[in-house]
A protein has these predicted regions:
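Hydrophobic alpha-helix feature that most strongly marks membrane-spanning transmembrane helices
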Residues: 69, 87, 252, 298, ...
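C-terminal amphipathic alpha-helical interaction region
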Residues: 493, 498-697
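Hydrophobic/aromatic-rich, well-ordered segments within soluble, folded domains that form packed cores
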Residues: 61, 65-69, 285-299, 325, ...
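Gly-rich Lys/Arg/Thr-decorated short loops/hinges at beta-loop-alpha junctions or inter-strand turns
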Residues: 1-14, 33-35, 223-232
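Glycine-rich, acidic/polar active-site loops that bind/position phosphate-bearing ligands
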Residues: 120-306, 315-318, 325-563
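Short linear, low-complexity motifs centered on an aromatic residue
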Residues: 73-89, 108, 207, 214-216, ...
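Active-site core of metal-dependent hydrolases
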Residues: 7-120
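Active-site-proximal loop/turn and secondary-structure-junction residues that shape catalytic pockets
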Residues: 44-48, 68-70, 98-99, 146, ...
Length: 697
């Protein structure tokens, strides 16, 4: 295979391949489309399509697909071959510019949330030239957006690209005011840290709950979990190391910058982190990464679990969304600068983020809301459901000094005025790493830690980009008309700090006292998905997202509907799986063991009625009680699921699930898990937590 540099990005139609396979004129025209959004001429599209097809066929591809990200949360693709009939009865390999730019998949079976009727099947895919095409297996995959016949976004890429453009538009206004004439565009970059579990495939196949839902619905706590803290950063087991090596190779071939890998806190839990890339590309790459992780695992006799909470009692999995803003000239706008103006510029962008997170904390919470993530958030392993920002003591001290017009200690008692004084330099390390914060500043970026491990990162970045764009718009509107730029700038930053300091919290987010303090500050707290999703339609949210043309009101309403539907369907599948497992596996197992014990007692009594059999009799009594409880709790859960059919709408159904079904699922699990602890191992019908968590050797 050669060195990594020999095969890195070998399956990607990237800039190097374009230069080598396109004429200079076609290449320059395509670059203009990629860099500036210029319209692509039909002749150029045909030339690009022909070169792309020749390159792909040369790598063994026989088909192409418009690869898109519908609102299911996973990717979608329909494969068409390159073959066309030739006059002599043979075939030619053909691919036109029209086929490259636009596709027409059937949209009827994808979630639309009422944006179209089922009979209105036509949907369109449109090529995203900013994200390179790639080869997967024998198929050329062309990243695309996906919309309805009427033009409404039916995917996650379209609003993400819109949000990036909205932020670029407003950030450019600010940068012009600071005299940055050489900057042509501003982009957000993301590096998502992907957590996951690896378990033996042969054990996975014996667990209906893992197969149907991606998480264990039953399972008693094993003698050992993560108490010893010996797995985090521990020596990677040979089988896992082999998996990681193959995974890296597959990712590198696709140009995915896989960088860091290590064991995570829970047994069998691991993490993969890439180098940062532009947000839409990072989103595409993360979707690919999750798919490839699961495929490579199968080759190693493993299963990769991406659910946020596959096992109770140990940490779940998240996906830290490391987000930054930079210019095309290479300036990170979240890094303090060397000159007074650079520091004022940094503080303005910092304040824009602070204001955005405070004003739209509900949208950030909504962006990570799923049934799976509800198990993780606020569970002393992940940030709470309350959104707050961590800045660190030194940056906090600087903001306090600006707010109060008081000297900052580290600045030698010198009162700072923005645009006049240089912000004191501080090492990135002084910002610490508060793992309990949902949204932490870590030196030159923000780390949004609420995203779930199976989630697309698109949603979180759509809301974050749009909210920051709104803050920057407000700032630009005020500064562009200011008579005294420096005075207005200082006043505006000072006002932002005063008005939005409630969102800043540098303490322990796991502490219950913080939830009480957050309530006093007036911060929103939405513990579950049904609590937060309806707030997407709050007036301020509709106004902001529509004003920046990120989502229309109809698109927002559809997403509200789809998110609630997904929540309901997910939990109902879990509940029905529990009912099935309880009746067909757990109850027969407990009854079988009880019968064996009863037979043993009868055999002993047949020898002598004086034999006490106290242990067996006590255990039989306990198992009999548990059997009745499991049966009763199963019936109660089934009844609560059946009651959902009477719900007036999806919101009412979601509330009923939150208020009744979830609790009855927990009650059934509690008695079933207790039964596991007193049932002989040979009778228990599926692998235990101990086997699953410590099965990869």
């Amino acid at each position: 295979m050669g060195t990594v540099s020999d095969y890195f990005s070998c399956l990607v139609f990237d800039d190097r391949v374009m230069k080598a396979n396109l004429s200079a004129d076609v290449y320059q025209s395509l670059r203009k489309t990629i860099d500036q959004g210029a319209k692509l001429d039909a002749s150029v599209a045909n030339a690009v399509a022909a070169a792309m097809k020749d390159w792909a066929v040369g790598h063994g591809a026989t088909h192409y697909t418009h690869w898109f990200q519908p609102l299911t949360g996973i990717t979608a693709e329909k494969h068409d071959s390159f073959i066309s009939p030739a006059p002599d009865g043979g075939i030619i390999m053909d691919f036109s510019g029209k086929e490259l730019i636009k596709g027409e998949p059937d949209a009827s079976s994808f979630p639309s949330g009422g944006l179209r009727a089922t009979f209105e099947a036509r949907g369109y895919t449109a090529w995203d030239p900013t994200s390179y095409a790639f080869i997967k297996g024998k198929t050329l995959c062309i990243p695309t957006a996906f919309c309805s016949y009427g033009g409404e976004a039916l995917d996650k890429k379209t609003p993400l690209l819109r949000s990036m453009e909205a932020l670029n538009r407003q950030a450019m206004r600010i940068l012009k005011l600071f005299g940055n004439e050489d900057v042509k565009c501003v982009r957000t970059s993301v590096g998502p840290e992907q957590e996951y579990f690896l378990i033996p495939k042969e054990l996975y196949e014996q667990r209906k709950d893992l197969i149907y839902t991606g998480r264990t619905l039953f399972g008693a706590k094993p003698p050992k979990g993560q108490e010893m803290d010996d797995h985090y950063f521990g020596v990677i087991k040979p089988r896992v190391a082999a998996y990681m090596a193959d995974l890296n190779e597959e990712l590198w071939k696709l140009g995915i910058l896989a960088k860091t890998e290590h064991n995570e806190v829970a047994p069998a839990q691991h993490e993969l982190a890439p180098i940062y890339s532009t947000t839409n590309i990072a989103t595409d790459h993360n979707q690919l990464t999750m798919e490839i992780m699961q495929k490579v695992a199968a080759k190693h006799g493993l299963v990769c679990l991406l659910h946020e909470k596959p096992f109770a009692g140990v940490n779940g999995s998240g996906k830290h969304n490391n987000w930054s803003i930079a210019t095309d000239t290479g300036v990170n706008l979240l890094s303090p600068g060397e000159t007074p103006y650079e520091n004022a510029q940094f503080l303005l962008f910092l304040c824009a983020v602070i204001k955005a997170v405070d004003d739209y904390q509900d949208l950030l919470r909504i962006s990570v809301a799923t049934a799976g993530n509800d198990h993780r958030l606020g569970a002393n392993e992940a940030p709470p459901a309350v959104v707050s920002i961590f800045l660190g003591d030194e940056l906090q001290g600087i903001l306090d000094a600006i707010e109060n017009d008081t000297p900052y200690e580290a600045a030698r008692k010198k009162t700072m005025k923005l645009g006049v004084d240089v912000l004191p330099r501080f090492a990135r390390d002084t910002t610490d790493r508060n793992r309990t914060s949902p949204f932490a500043f870590t030196g030159n970026k923000f780390e949004f830690r609420m995203v779930g491990s199976s989630n697309s990162i698109a949603c979180a970045n759509i809301m974050l980009n749009a909210a920051v764009a709104e803050s920057l718009k407000i700032y630009a509107d005020r500064l562009e008309g200011a008579e005294n730029f420096e005075a207005k700038l200082h006043e505006m930053i000072q006002k932002t700090i005063k008005d939005h300091k409630r969102i800043i919290f540098n303490g322990n987010g796991y502490d219950d006292a913080w939830l009480e303090e957050a309530a006093r500050r007036g911060l929103s707290n939405y513990p579950t998905t049904p609590d937060c999703i309806p707030h997407i339609m709050d007036g301020k949210n509709v106004q902001m997202l529509t004003a920046h043309k990120v989502l229309s009101e109809a698109e927002m309403r559809s997403r509200c509907e789809i998110l609630l539907e997904n929540y309901c369907k997910t939990v109902i599948i879990e509940a029905n799986t529990m009912i099935d497992i309880a009746r067909k596996q757990i109850l027969p197992a407990v009854q079988g063991y009880t019968a064996e014990l009863a037979g043993g007692v009868a055999a002993k009594k047949a020898i002598s009625t004086d034999i006490v059999c106290g242990y067996e009799s006590g255990l039989i009594a306990r198992l009999s009680v548990l059997t009745d409880q499991i049966a009763a709790k199963t019936d109660e859960l089934e009844a609560s699921v059946l009651e959902l059919k009477g719900a007036a709408d999806v919101a009412q159904e979601a509330y009923a699930i939150r208020d009744a079904v979830i609790g009855r699922m927990a009650a059934l699990r509690a008695v079933a898990d207790e039964a596991e602890t007193v049932t002989a191992e040979k009778y228990w019908p599926f692998p235990t937590y101990g086997e699953l968590l410590f099965g990869v050797r």
